[in-house]
Regions:
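Structural and coupling elements of P-loop NTPases
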Residues: 1-660
Length: 660
């Protein structure tokens, strides 16, 4: 019998307990001897030095385990907004997911963002309400919050039992059983407990079973008939109905417990096996697809690879090697199975989304993604498409300590930019680089990795806000000529503003008709490249239409000459006075204890923020505000000081506003 495969991702807001739950899952499955603690830097899934130091997930860690004859590939994704591209790439490789909701904080900003990504990507999702080790946190309130904010009806599968103010067991709705801890800390069924023996929580367990039957009856006629006739529905039949329910958009199966104390985890894993889909069928002509790139010190670059074929080692293409990836360790395998995930080393440099056919040659699929993570095909995203989904908000100048290291730093930055589509590198003719990042955390991590993993000694300037530059008016044509020896290039160029953020390049009919394809492509590429740095150097030039009214060239003109001629023409054409700066405006979502609410809110207002939404429950204060990014640059340190480290916040780009 072929062992079924489940590819699962786990998502959450920062500090909801996602990695702690991942560790508990691995412990329950027997993959680790004890669950590693995030706060001690011992989490198995967070293997990078930066992850251990910061206590956050940066790269999507992959683990493998077996549970009751089902093989799981388990991907722990980052919760921090700076690493949203990691989440998008993880979702390209899975069919199911666990979304963790903290009972302490409820549905938070990144919870909503993650849920939206899951829905638009078509990934079936199971919820886990965490942090119920504290009886002061209400499961009922969390369920109401889920329904109100996420718009799905949670169907409860487990709930906690308390004794002396501590969680002591969980009740499993489907199996009608009670799970407690054994002497080794594992969850086991309590054989001394029976739901029909009149225990205090028996009535509540039966109530949730009846609710599950009621919800499942909307998807299963057999269950509906038994329910109408007033007959009991056996667990196996309910299981079948809940499988159909789990595939709907109206409901979400919900497990509840405490990852920290290891309650509710065993039932959750069984639920992942029961209710999440198996891997789909693939084209057997394909060996598989690159879904992620990784770099390890001492190992070098590897590709995370999703196999599309079953193939034994003797049939692997020449030069290819496949392994299991456990944190940063490579474990050899003797065969690959369709749908399974492996680490791959190949004789050539790979790119995200590349499909490799069985003979070892490459096809690069034309897939694309939206900013919300929606797949327009079943293929993993290519870096070139995913880059368009993330807007870098910071730019930082970096240069070598020693000029002899230039080539090494250049190669290292190339590897990092290929690994992370949201990170971009801009080369300057002066011998330095600008690093374009989504946020400060991403920048700090990249600089640390350059030093630790690649051995690069660089000097980094202070990060600056990336503004948008826009034309104020239509600009009359200019002419420019560039000549080296007998080779000459001339261009006549004008520019006008567009209402959108797009770039448009219009070529004269004569030029289009007479120029060869490589010349046309070279001109387009050269003009687009000038928009990356802008005129003032503050950020990209957007919303512009270049019109090439005339273009002449001599045979033998090289691409660098075209680039130089076009760049000089743009410099002639657009002056600083022609530019209006637009600054990024962020939506700040923050929560803190109520006793810090006044200080935190006052600080945001002093930074030019406009509070637009206030909430909370009398214990936790929440609010949303629109604030210019330049006013909250380095905000993490300030809010940590004001709130004594108790505030949590996230930022989302709303758009750009003209600077006064």
């Amino acid at each position: 019998m072929i062992q079924p495969i489940r590819n699962i991702a786990i998502l959450a807001h920062v500090d909801a307990g996602k990695t702690t739950l991942s560790e508990r899952i691995l412990f329950s499955a027997g993959e680790v001897r004890r669950p590693g603690k995030v706060e001690e830097g011992l989490a198995t899934m967070d293997y990078m030095a930066e992850e251990k130091e910061r206590g956050i997930t940066i790269e999507s860690g992959v683990a493998h385990f077996e549970w009751k004859n089902t093989w799981f590939n388990f991907i722990d994704t980052p919760g921090h907004v700076d690493f949203g591209a990691e989440v998008d790439m993880a979702l390209s490789a899975v069919e199911g997911a666990v979304l963790v909701v903290s009972a302490a904080s409820g549905v938070e900003t990144q919870t909503v963002a993650a849920f939206k990504k899951l829905r638009t990507a078509g990934v079936r999702t199971i919820l886990y309400v965490n942090k119920l080790d504290n009886p002061d946190y209400s499961l009922d309130e969390a369920l109401i919050n889920i329904e109100e904010v996420l718009g799905v009806r949670p169907v409860l599968m487990t709930f906690p039992e308390y004794e002396n103010g501590k969680i002591s067991a969980v009740l499993d709705v489907l199996s009608q059983s009670r799970l407690v801890h054994s002497d080794t800390g594992e969850e086991v069924v309590d054989d001394t407990w029976n739901v029909d023996d009149g225990w205090d929580n028996s009535r509540e367990l039966k109530k949730y079973y009846t609710e599950a039957v009621e919800f499942a009856s909307n998807f299963d006629d057999e269950i509906l008939k038994l329910a109408i006739d007033g007959k009991s529905v056996p667990p196996k039949m309910l299981l079948k109905g809940l499988r159909s329910l789990a595939a709907s958009d109206e409901y979400a199966l919900c497990y509840a417990g405490s990852a920290l104390d290891g309650f509710g985890v065993r039932s959750l894993i069984s639920g992942l096996s029961f209710f999440l889909p198996e891997v789909p069928e693939f084209d057997e002509a394909e060996l598989g697809q690159v879904i992620r790139l990784r770099h390890f010190k001492g190992i070098g670059e590897i590709s995370l690879f999703r196999a599309h074929s079953n193939l034994e080692r003797r049939d692997w293409p020449t030069g290819f090697e496949f392994s299991r990836l456990r944190a940063n360790l490579l474990l050899p395998v003797e065969e690959i199975r369709a749908g399974d995930i492996y680490a791959m080393r190949s004789p050539f440099e790979t790119e995200l989304g590349q499909v490799i056919v069985r003979d070892g040659t490459i096809e690069t699929p034309a897939s694309s993604w939206s900013a919300e993570g929606a797949r327009t095909s079943d293929l993993a995203p290519r870096a070139s498409n995913l880059k368009d989904c993330y807007q870098p908000l910071l730019q930082t100048r970096v240069e070598c300590v020693s000029s002899e290291d230039y080539a090494h730093v250049e190669r290292s930055l190339s590897v990092l930019s290929r690994m992370d589509p949201s990170f971009r590198v801009q080369h300057d003719d002066g011998g330095f680089w600008y690093l374009h990042t989504v946020g400060e955390v991403q920048l700090d991590v990249l600089l640390a990795r350059l030093h630790r993993e690649f051995g690069c000694e660089v000097m980094a300037g202070q990060p600056e806000i990336r503004w948008q530059e826009r034309l104020c008016r239509e600009i009359s044509p200019v002419e420019n000529t560039f000549q080296i020896g007998p080779h000459k290039i001339s261009i006549k160029l004008s520019a006008s503003p567009l209402d959108s953020d797009a770039h448009d390049i219009r070529l004269s009919a004569e030029f289009l008709e007479n120029a060869p394809r490589d010349i046309l492509a070279g001109v387009r590429s050269a003009l687009l490249e000038t928009t990356e740095t802008g005129v003032l150097g503050k950020g990209p030039l957007v919303g512009i239409c270049f019109e090439v009214l005339h273009f002449e060239w001599t045979e033998g003109a090289l691409p660098p000459m075209i680039k130089k001629c076009c760049a000089d023409a743009v410099t002639k054409l657009i002056k600083p006075a022609d530019i209006q700066l637009y600054e990024p405006i962020m939506e700040l979502s923050l929560e803190c204890p109520v006793n810090f609410a006044g200080l935190v809110t006052g600080d945001i207002q002093a930074r030019g923020g406009k509070v637009k939404e206030i909430g909370g429950d009398g214990r936790i204060h929440t609010f949303k505000a629109d604030v210019p990014l330049r006013k909250i640059f380095g905000y993490a340190t300030g809010v940590r000081s004001i709130s004594k480290g108790t505030a949590l916040y996230s930022l989302k780009l709303l758009g750009y506003r003209a600077s006064i």
